């Protein structure tokens, strides 16, 4: 909307990422680009979308560290955006990153992030002479400060271990939820497609059957010191847009999904407590 491009909403598939067939149905001659959200760290099937010959922007806010067919997310020809917000696998507290293989795009982005200046702060400070910048475009300040950047860079050394710990914790949750699903109407939300050759386990979510009121489940769990929250939000239903579009899988996650407490250092004892409290709540509400 901010750049004159009204969004066209599309559904997600069972993996929580944009549903190729639904997008194809909505593409028109006016389609300028497709934004592919690598939701919860699950990559989209890029090869399928490549066939459409439409510019793509990858939203990998949750995807840092995951791989698509043996290549890290972001290793494509498209613009790719990342978030390093506090709950991400690699964090700088706040902030993010944009990557591109296009030199002209990169130069434009560097200018846009720094008030629209023609000279980067690094170029100006390293110059052996007076370097006068000019402002070629109207923009604002989107630069990441040096200290948060250093914090993120330092984590790269231990990032593989971070993913290993998350994988171990995620697989343990999977085992426990599968056991619960034999007696309760719940299912694992973290379904991983075969083309995802490395999953970063950004978070752990599950989907409750419609017999349960998800909000009540979350409320009771939180009162019992289980810091869960509701799942993926349906952005087309937010007040900023409030569009009437039929997106059934999106609404399933929106209405019945929840995130369990999840981080690399979570202990087995903590996970067992979460599962036991969840079991108690499901017993209480069914």
Predicted regions and their residues:
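PLP-dependent aminotransferase-like
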Residues: 1-63, 67
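Conserved active-site segment immediately N-terminal to the catalytic lysine
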Residues: 58-92, 107, 131-136
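Structural detector of well-ordered beta-strand residues that form the stable sheet scaffold
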Residues: 8, 56-57, 81, 187-189, ...
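Positions that flank functional sites
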Residues: 15, 64, 89, 235-237
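Short beta-strand-to-turn element immediately C-terminal to the catalytic PLP-Schiff-base lysine
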Residues: 82-83, 96-102, 153
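PLP-dependent aminotransferase class I/II
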Residues: 19-25, 33-37, 67, 103-286
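Short, conserved catalytic or interaction motifs in soluble domains
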Residues: 12, 86, 262
């Amino acid at each position: 909307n901010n750049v004159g491009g009204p969004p066209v909403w599309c559904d997600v598939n069972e993996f929580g990422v944009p549903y190729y067939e639904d997008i194809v149905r909505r593409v028109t001659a006016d389609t300028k680009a497709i934004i592919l959200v690598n939701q919860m760290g699950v990559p989209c099937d890029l090869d399928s979308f490549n066939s459409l010959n439409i510019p793509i922007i990858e939203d990998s806010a949750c995807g840092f560290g995951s791989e698509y067919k043996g290549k890290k997310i972001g290793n494509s020809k498209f613009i790719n955006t990342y978030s390093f917000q506090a709950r991400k696998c690699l964090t700088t507290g706040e902030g993010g990153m944009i990557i591109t293989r296009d030199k002209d795009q990169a130069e434009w982005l560097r200018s846009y992030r720094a008030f629209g200046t023609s000279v980067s702060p690094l170029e100006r400070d390293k110059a052996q002479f007076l370097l006068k910048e000019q402002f070629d475009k109207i923009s604002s300040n989107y630069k990441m400060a040096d200290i948060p950047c250093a914090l993120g860079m330092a984590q790269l050394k231990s990032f593989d271990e971070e993913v290993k710990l998350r994988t171990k914790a995620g697989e343990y949750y999977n085992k426990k939820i599968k056991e619960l699903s034999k007696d309760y109407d719940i299912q694992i939300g973290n379904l991983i497609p075969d083309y995802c050759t490395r999953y970063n386990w950004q978070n752990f979510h599950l989907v409750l059957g419609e017999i349960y009121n998800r909000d009540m489940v979350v409320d009771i769990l939180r009162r019992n010191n289980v810091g869960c929250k509701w799942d993926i939000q349906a952005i087309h239903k937010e007040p900023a847009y409030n569009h009437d579009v039929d997106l059934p899988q999106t609404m399933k996650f929106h209405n019945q999904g929840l995130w369990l407490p999840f981080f690399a250092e979570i202990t087995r004892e903590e996970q067992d407590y979460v599962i036991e409290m969840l079991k108690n709540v499901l017993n209480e509400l069914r």
